[in-house]
């Protein structure tokens, strides 16, 4: 093991420093990485115990956001970090996705990668640095990790691509994507865009890959100093005699018949029955003790799945036929409905084959904005999308708990896709919440969410610029051929080589996500996949526009009503009143809710009755208006003194009508008026101290 080492290099205007052997020395692998003023610590460890009975790599990636990294104390009653925030979960997924395919297929030991954010500057988000740190930590460790990866964030500002754009540059960028990959190819993409073209997207990915190569060269330079002995993983196989008998019993034509059943559940059932039939026959012929039988059974099941996978891929490549009978470029049948729920503010049902999303839109008042408080961001969020994937959508039985990482990730992608067409606050002051309930799933449910969400937004009368549609693309590759699949279903996602999701409008791409199970994809394949995805997106958009072509002109009668008014920020105190007295009285009298921006003076009034909302607005206008000489009021007498009447013109505004200004009533005013009477007065003077002098207005 090497002692403490440090490496530094300039990249993209920032200094990148890696330290090894100083901290977390008991971890199998640890990398301290500083990029700019952002610092992350990645640690990688593996259990010595093999987990029995699992058919996947048990990898866990944790991303810890420490508030001290940004010089902040966590909000709330308990002043310490709790469960991972949504942003931390998304960052963990961002790191997980490019590294997961690089573990041996048969690794069955628990692997835990923890990326801890220790310091952060606003211009160098630590999530992408975490990909670089994770790759180093895994390569420093004894864990059998088979590759070197790195990632970059790329923007598109004023016609120029920018690697690791600053926070200010991202505000004006048409593009915000994270790209990860190896030296040879791109393996992961995640991000959003403002209707960029396919050509611009490919160009961005190629620029990003050139930057990734530079980072990987630095990694290679570091790792050349290491000669770590890696843990050996033995590839488990069924016994030779069992494999031989399995090959004899398996009839390819029988397997083919079952693979080409169009309906997902029936296909799954028939494949399961055939698998169990074969394995049962084998165990009838061979004596195997109970302890070994469980392992051999699992290995035979894996062997069957591998045979089915190879046959499905062979049929697609050689015959151009997919499991449900479609051609590679064919989309599943689509139906769209809007207004399916009578009491919601907007709703839509989008069905594509055996994938179905129910989209629901709820409109809320400005005070219902989501508060955002992370180490990278503070503020509020007006456009929110939540994605729910209940177990019944795939015919399973599972406990209902909170959203998992997958649900959070899918919802975030769909939100980014739709956010590009969402109206500005000035045009539509509502908080908008979109919920996607996945009622049925056979692949591409996140893209179905984009479609149902777009339809529901128009149904709700939200003035989105245009429809957004999404489609998931797949890839099947062998030594000589590559076939891009349009609108993949679950089986093709599971057994294919790529999951490539593209969402956008007729004008361009608004969200993009790609994950590869192979070494990666090159420029020509990206061009082909994006071109094919655009053709599919146009078809889907045509169907959506046939269903509802523009946002409804009026909101649902059950939606809240909002009216805005801007007042002088100096008048905010008067509107609130001492102890909130004035604003509370308005809320109670007109049955509304009010939010005030004390910096801009913007006042939002929210209620269910249009008349009451309008009345409240008029009342606020009157209350906060500048009083000028000549203005007339019907005011209430609050006090009577020998020298005149004190009259409340509006809450908090009182003037004095001197006895000499009361006309014919100047001598007998104390007998004629009493406290609480309403009198019509006119403003005759306002002195330098702001005191208002009144006179009796002529009847």
UniProtKB/Swiss-Prot annotation:
Residues 560-620 form the KH domain. Keywords: Cytoplasm, Magnesium, Metal-binding, Nucleotidyltransferase, RNA-binding, Transferase. It is found in: Cytoplasm. One of its GO terms (biological process) is RNA processing. It is an enzyme of class 2 (transferase). It catalyses: RNA(n+1) + phosphate = RNA(n) + a ribonucleoside 5'-diphosphate. Pfam families: KH_1, PNPase, RNase_PH, RNase_PH_C, S1. Its EC number is 2.7.7.8. Residues 630-697 form the S1 motif domain. Belongs to the polyribonucleotide nucleotidyltransferase family. Involved in mRNA degradation. Catalyzes the phosphorolysis of single-stranded polyribonucleotides processively in the 3'- to 5'-direction. This is Polyribonucleotide nucleotidyltransferase. The gene is pnp.
